[in-house]
Structure formats: structure tokens, C-alpha cells
């Protein structure tokens, strides 16, 4: 694959799509090859750079991957599960790698993505922020030391338009903690509390969700004991942190063989 990675951005008109276009235009080693929106969108035919507010790029927004198949090496997809799955089928058939930031997949959809990774290289992550992925490693360490005797709660807050809850990042936090404790998240997660719930179940991991205003993303894991409490928090103030991480993932993915990867692989966190 050429040193200059050509990327296509799915969902070009969305909040993340525009940030991804701007990042592709600004980051050395990456070229914006294509931008995509759904059929019937009023944005079709627009210049992608002007749409993102970063100047003319000469790349027009299209509705069909077929029409731009020769213009990109890697598809970056932060859309919705149904759209991502359609894009996945195309990329598998045409040998295109994918960076997937979509969340809310069903177990069957996750299995389909895993199967596709036998044929094309895929980075799948709930969050592309470097800070969040470092936090996941810190949570594993905290859980190993404190998780056996502390109450563990995960709190997350996002903007009013987010459609899935808990966030993919919150679930990844829970999975990191549960894994460090030798448990499955499914066996210990508590997602709702309403009415007379009784005392907190020992060993459970609780989740709390807020949706309000324009919050980009805030996540906190709490390890609470009697007399002290440890909180590990990440706050994102701009979606550009996710977009920059996605470009970093795309650059790394260009040199990889087919397989399923995550941001820990991209950042080589397992070697630290």
C-alpha cells in the first residue's frame, strides 16, 4: 500500500464525519479520497472540505461506494450499525480495510465483523481517543488492586443526540474492569436501578447515564470503599481528539495484514 493513505469518510455530513474530513485534510500522510452520505441527502455533490469548514478539497460527497471504489484504501466509518454493516460487506468484497468507530452493534453484528476480519484488516474501537485507551489500561490496574473489595460504578455523559446507552466507551470500561477481575461483564453489570432495589449486590458493576446539551463525552470509573474513593475520569472537549485517533489508526492499519485490531494494537499499549 502506498505511504500516503487514501481514506473515505462515511457519514460525511454528521458531527464526527465533518471532524474526520477536517482531520484527513490536516494530518500528514493521509489523503481524503472520498466522502459519503446516504442516498437522497441534500449534501450530495457538495465539496467535502467546504462541508467540514476546512476549504475546497476537490472531493465531492457521493452516495455510493461503488462510484468511489478506486479512490480510497481505507474506509473510516462512525455511522450507525445498519450503515456500517452494509459498508462492511462492500469492503470485504473489494479488499478495503476499515476503521470502525460505530457503537451499538448486536452480538450477531459483532460476529459478522469478526468474520470479515479474516479477509480484510479492521480496527474496531469504542473510542479512538489516546487518553481513553490509556485510561482502560489504568482501570485494569486499579481493578486488580482494589476491585475485590470496592464498589465499582461507571458514570458517562454525552450530548442529547446520542442514541445508544450506555456508551460504547462505558461498556469497554466495564469489560476492562470485569476482565481484570476474571469475570464477564454480562454476569455483574447493573444498568438500571428503580424503586426499592435493596442493598447493592457485592461484586456488581453499576452504570449511570446522562444525556444533555452538547457534552462531547465524559467517563468516570469509581472504586469506592469505606473511607476513601478512587475516581478515574476522562473528559473530551472536542471531537477532533477522536478524529485524530482515527487517522492514526488508519495510518497504522495500512501496513497490517487482515485481522481484527483495536486501539491498544495501534498504540502498542500491550508492550508497555
UniProtKB/Swiss-Prot annotation:
(S)-2,3,4,5-tetrahydrodipicolinate binds at residues 159, 168-169. It is found in: Cytoplasm. NAD(+) binds at residues 11-16, 37, 101-103, 125-128. Its main location: cytoplasm. Pathway: Amino-acid biosynthesis; L-lysine biosynthesis via DAP pathway; (S)-tetrahydrodipicolinate from L-aspartate: step 4/4. GO terms for molecular function: 4-hydroxy-tetrahydrodipicolinate reductase; NAD binding; NADP binding; oxidoreductase activity, acting on CH or CH2 groups, NAD or NADP as acceptor. GO terms for cellular component: cytosol. Keywords: Amino-acid biosynthesis, Cytoplasm, Diaminopimelate biosynthesis, Lysine biosynthesis, NAD, NADP, Oxidoreductase. GO terms for biological process: diaminopimelate biosynthetic process; lysine biosynthetic process via diaminopimelate. It catalyses: (S)-2,3,4,5-tetrahydrodipicolinate + NAD(+) + H2O = (2S,4S)-4-hydroxy-2,3,4,5-tetrahydrodipicolinate + NADH + H(+); (S)-2,3,4,5-tetrahydrodipicolinate + NADP(+) + H2O = (2S,4S)-4-hydroxy-2,3,4,5-tetrahydrodipicolinate + NADPH + H(+). SUPFAM superfamilies: Glyceraldehyde-3-phosphate dehydrogenase-like, C-terminal domain, NAD(P)-binding Rossmann-fold domains. Its EC number is 1.17.1.8. NADP(+) binds at residue 38. The active site is at 158 (proton donor/acceptor), 162 (proton donor). It holds the Pfam family DapB_C. Catalyzes the conversion of 4-hydroxy-tetrahydrodipicolinate (HTPA) to tetrahydrodipicolinate. Belongs to the DapB family. NCBIfam families: dapB. Homotetramer. This is 4-hydroxy-tetrahydrodipicolinate reductase.
